[in-house]
Amino acid sequence: MRQVVLNILIAFLWVLFQDEDSFQFSTFVSGFIIGLIVIYILHRFFGQAFYPKKIWIAIKFLGVYLYQLITSSISIINYILFKTRHMNPGLLTYETNLKNDWAITFLTILIIITPGSTVIRISKTTNKFFIHSIDVSEKEKESLLKSIKQYENLITEVSQ
């Protein structure tokens, strides 16, 4: 976070030092790029990774989540319109490797927001999720657990 604020500060200082009559977005962008270069050179002194890596991870995370949201929404629409009699609702468990409370909460929110599944309970001792799903057939169960594992890996990547 400090790196982002510092980069924006460098960009604004660059705009001020250019002595232009009005604010030019192109000057701000060039200052932002200069700030990126300065921060890249000095990022070892911050004790953190260079921040554009985190931005890329967040964009990748958003893309994966939007893909999962769209595909699960289409799947739920398919169940509602055509397979109402063939639904197999039930519970399944998922054991997570996440340790932070915020990471577990974030994973819970992602599972709840995804259509067709909700978290019923989280075991505090074993970090096991009890999840209700609209269909726990072998194929759907495998698909749901795969997407949850993908969320977990991305949360782990973001938190490092």
Swiss-Prot record:
Report any Pfam family annotated for this entry. Answer: MNHE
- Kindly indicate whether the keyword ATP-binding belongs to this entry: no
Molecular function terms, GO-annotated: antiporter activity; monoatomic cation transmembrane transporter activity
Which topology term describes how it sits in the membrane? Multi-pass membrane protein
Q: Which GO terms describe its cellular component?
A: plasma membrane
Q: Which InterPro entries match?
A: Cation_antiport_E (IPR002758)
**Which top-level group of life is the source organism from?**
Bacteria
Task: Give the residue spans that cross the bilayer.
Answer: 22-42, 61-81, 102-122
- Record-annotated disulphide pairs: none
| Entry annotated with the keyword Cell division | no
Compartment list? Cell membrane
Q: Principal place where this protein is found?
A: membrane
- Keywords, A to Z? Antiport, Cell membrane, Ion transport, Membrane, Transmembrane, Transmembrane helix, Transport
Q: How does it assemble?
A: May form a heterooligomeric complex that consists of seven subunits: mnhA2, mnhB2, mnhC2, mnhD2, mnhE2, mnhF2 and mnhG2.
Q: Hey, which family's this protein in?
A: Belongs to the CPA3 antiporters (TC 2.A.63) subunit E family.
What protein name is recorded for this chain? Putative antiporter subunit mnhE2
Please give the organism: Staphylococcus haemolyticus (strain JCSC1435)
The gene name on file is mnhE2
